[in-house]
Amino acid sequence: MKFAVAIAFTLLVCVFAQEEEEPVTCGGKQCKPNSCCVQNSHGKGKDSPRCHPLGKLNNPCEVEPNENGIYSQHCPCGEGLSCTKVGEPNKLRCQEESGKSDKSKESQGSDESEESEESKESCG
């Protein structure tokens, strides 16, 4: 029975892993996954939208795009991060989501991470 549940779980993980996000169109081009469309209103590249990667830890970020789905200067944060006011003058930066820290990641059992890696490998 446990084996059947493990097989079902692996198949479910594979199905979700293969689902693709709807690509973002930016300046007539499709952005890669984990990116957004930014249209700077200042300096070089003014008014030409371009694809940029989602924010990483401590990168500047934005929360909401305009009505066309375009961000004015920075992408939102990548997975596991949230756009949070940090320091003075309260600039928005990508920070670990509350409740998550390196220690909590380290304290997770190795069985869980091994199972996840096995699932990824079996997806092809």
Curated annotation (Swiss-Prot):
Compartment(s) where it occurs, according to its Swiss-Prot or TrEMBL record: Secreted
Keyword Secreted: yes
Acidic residues: compositionally biased ranges: 109-118
Compositionally biased intervals (Basic and acidic residues): 93-108
GO molecular function: toxin activity
Domain of life: Eukaryota
A GO CC annotation given for this chain: extracellular region
Annotated tissue distribution: Expressed by the venom gland.
Signal sequence range: 1-17
Region Disordered, annotated ranges: 93-124
Chief place of localization: secreted
Keywords in alphabetical order: Disulfide bond, Secreted, Signal, Toxin
Disulfide bonds: C26-C37, C31-C51, C36-C75, C61-C83, C77-C94
Family: Belongs to the neurotoxin 32 family.
Name of protein: U33-theraphotoxin-Cg1a
Lineage, highest ranks first: Eukaryota, Metazoa, Ecdysozoa, Arthropoda, Chelicerata
